[in-house]
Each structure stands twice: as C-alpha cells, then as structure tokens.
Design a protein with these regions (language model features):
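Leucine-rich solenoid repeat scaffolds
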Residues: 89-91
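Left-handed beta-helix
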Residues: 9, 15, 20-21, 26-35, ...
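Terminal amphipathic alpha-helical/low-complexity segments used for targeting or macromolecular assembly
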Residues: 1-10
C-alpha cells in the first residue's frame, strides 16, 4: 500500500509512522512524513507537507492538530494538542 500511495499520489507515509485514530488527509498530494514521526488522534493534514528529516529525533504531533498546506515541520519538535499550524509555516 505504501508504494501505491507514493506512486499515485506522491504521499510517503512509511508503515513505521505511529498514527492515532481519525487521521484526515485533505487534498492528498505531496506529503512526506519521516519514518519515526508520531501523529496523535484526530489530526488533519493538508497538501505539500513535510514532517521530519532523515536524522535526529522524530517530530511528535499531539491530538486534534490541524496542519495547513505547504508546511514544513522539522525533527525534534513536539506540537501540543489542539494546535493549528497555518499555511506555509516552518516549525
């Protein structure tokens, strides 16, 4: 499934990513998530999103988080519950 999503939609979410219940992907295209990322429950992610890098500690995203389009979340970041990250942000 990972390779099919990657090829067809440009979504790279490795099977090792920990994802809580109720993840919503709006306009799913151009999404890259590092393999050690943790995403809480009921999160909403938008297109052109990058989370993490190839080294260091993972990004941890809390519950009920909205991430707008064209956002870059780097490694070693903890995003709290009930947070909104606006379009084009670098965290």
């Amino acid at each position: 499934m990972y390779s099919r999503l990657s090829r067809k939609y440009g979504i790279q979410i490795p099977p090792t990513v920990k994802i809580g219940y109720g993840l919503y992907i709006g306009h799913g295209i151009g999404i890259i998530i590092n393999d050690s990322t943790v995403i809480g429950s009921n999160c909403n992610i938008s297109q052109f999103l990058t989370i993490g890098s190839n080294r260091g500690t993972p990004a941890i995203i809390g519950d009920n988080v909205y991430i707008g389009p064209s956002v870059c979340i780097v490694e070693n970041v903890r995003i709290g519950n009930n947070t909104t990250i606006g379009a084009g942000s670098v965290v």
